[in-house]
């Protein structure tokens, strides 16, 4: 078995190292990650300049001076001799639930695997601290082992969020849907030393839909949240109404 491992926190991130060590007994693991922290990079590709790949002298991890998506793209299309059995991303420093998934570089790295027909799993640790990172890595390895032993049909994309709890306090796995957040806080406006305005993106909004069945609800109750995602963004329930709307508009012109 072969696993391609990436993340969005960068190749020096503790979450990447912990997940690598947890996955090594399960498969041959190649690491290709961004050189820098790319949180919030989403599915962006670097198209305006060439990319360079380096290798850490201490860990052997490969890293690219680009985005999480760049990392997986370069590995799959330019470095690996054969397609891996699984792309794994994480462990992220902080949750990726609800609307977070649209911005997440962690999820994006996994998504790039799906783009090339490779099943993928993204792992995130709820709350921005590493207090129970080794426990989270243990859970991640259990999920990966279960997938390798019992693959889901097709090319699944799973988004996994692990509560920041000791292993013994975790209550199991829950399959969930994405919750929803309130809009993020307004940007923070400051003045730089030259007297020019600068802006910081505000904090993420609180949970709006954290009802039973959502990722927010499951992790708050101590469960590991597993949410199957898809690339098709088509709003199928709006197709009929949109056809009627478009037909009325084209007939009026």
Curated annotation (Swiss-Prot):
One of its GO terms (cellular component) is cytoplasm. Binds 1 divalent metal cation per subunit. Gene3D superfamilies: Survival protein SurE-like phosphatase/nucleotidase (3.40.1210.10). InterPro entries: SurE, SurE-like_Pase/nucleotidase, SurE-like_sf. It is found in: Cytoplasm. A divalent metal cation binds at residues 8-9, 39, 92. It catalyses: a ribonucleoside 5'-phosphate + H2O = a ribonucleoside + phosphate. Keywords: Cytoplasm, Hydrolase, Metal-binding, Nucleotide-binding. Pfam families: SurE. Its main location: cytoplasm. Its cofactor is a divalent metal cation. Its EC number is 3.1.3.5. One of its GO terms (molecular function) is nucleotide binding. Belongs to the SurE nucleotidase family. HAMAP family: SurE. Nucleotidase that shows phosphatase activity on nucleoside 5'-monophosphates. This is 5'-nucleotidase SurE. It comes from Burkholderia thailandensis (strain ATCC 700388 / DSM 13276 / CCUG 48851 / CIP 106301 / E264).
């Amino acid at each position: 078995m072969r696993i391609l491992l990436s993340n969005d926190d960068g190749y020096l991130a503790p979450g990447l190292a912990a997940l690598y060590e947890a996955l090594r007994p399960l498969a041959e693991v190649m690491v290709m990650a961004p050189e820098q922290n790319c949180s919030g990079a989403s599915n962006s590709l670097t198209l305006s300049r060439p990319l360079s790949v380096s290798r850490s002298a201490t860990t052997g991890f490969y890293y690219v001076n680009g985005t999480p998506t760049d990392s997986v793209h370069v590995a799959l299309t330019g470095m690996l001799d054969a397609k891996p059995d699984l792309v794994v991303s994480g462990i992220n420093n902080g949750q990726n639930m609800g609307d977070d998934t649209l911005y997440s570089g962690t999820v994006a790295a996994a998504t790039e695997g799906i783009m090339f027909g490779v099943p993928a799993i993204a792992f995130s640790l709820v709350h921005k601290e590493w207090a129970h990172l080794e426990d989270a890595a243990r859970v991640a390895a259990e999920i990966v082992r279960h997938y390798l032993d019992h693959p889901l049909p097709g090319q699944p994309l799973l988004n996994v969020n692990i509560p920041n709890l000791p292993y013994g306090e975790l209550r199991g796995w829950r399959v969930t849907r994405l919750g929803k957040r309130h809009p993020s806080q307004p940007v923070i406006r400051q003045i730089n030393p030259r007297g020019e305005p600068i802006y910081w993106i505000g904090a993420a909004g609180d949970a709006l839909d954290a009802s039973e069945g959502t990722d927010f609800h499951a992790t708050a109750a101590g469960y590991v949240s597993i949410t199957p995602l898809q690339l098709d963004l088509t709003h199928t329930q709006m197709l009929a109404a949109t056809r009627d709307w478009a037909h009325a508009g084209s007939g009026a012109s």
